[in-house]
Amino acid sequence: MGNIKQTFIKRTARELFDRYPDKFTRDFEHNKKMVAELTNVTSKTIRNRIAGYITRLVRMKEEGKIL
């Protein structure tokens, strides 16, 4: 069993994904750079968790699991 993501990570990721849907891809490294550009997150750990969740959202959208 994995860990559950914290609420502020999910909220921030969803807001970024809704606001800039064309800027994110399935590539984690690209998403990591975009999160760094679009937010003022200073912590690498938080930035990576947000980018990872956005990568998951992109994959789920492509597979038709979310609208």
UniProtKB/Swiss-Prot annotation:
The organism's place on the tree of life at top rank: Archaea
Short name of any one Pfam family annotated for the protein: Ribosomal_S17e
GO-annotated molecular function: structural constituent of ribosome
Similarity comment: family membership: Belongs to the eukaryotic ribosomal protein eS17 family.
Stored NCBIfam families: PRK01151.1
Assembly behavior: Part of the 30S ribosomal subunit.
Keyword Ribonucleoprotein: yes
Keyword annotations from UniProtKB, A to Z: Ribonucleoprotein, Ribosomal protein
Name of the protein described by the UniProt record: Small ribosomal subunit protein eS17
UniProt GO cellular component terms: cytosol; ribonucleoprotein complex; ribosome
Organism of provenance: Thermococcus kodakarensis (strain ATCC BAA-918 / JCM 12380 / KOD1)
BP GO terms, sorted: translation
